[in-house]
Amino acid sequence: METLEKLKVLMEELSVDTTKFFKGNKSAGTRARKLSQEMKALLQTLRGEIL
């Protein structure tokens, strides 16, 4: 469950940074890509927990 909560928090942060990126903030795009990579790793962990 802890992994799922972390994913929810990362998704909220990703949403904020993605919105900022589309408004022209290029550094928010970098943060969004970093968050995407973190989410990918957490999703792999969650997948392992489910199996």
Positions of predicted regions on the chain:
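Short, charged, amphipathic alpha-helical segments
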Residues: 29-37
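Polytopic transmembrane helical bundles with strong interfacial aromatic enrichment
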Residues: 3-4, 9-19, 34, 41-51
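Short, surface-exposed loop/turn segments at secondary-structure junctions
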Residues: 22, 26-30
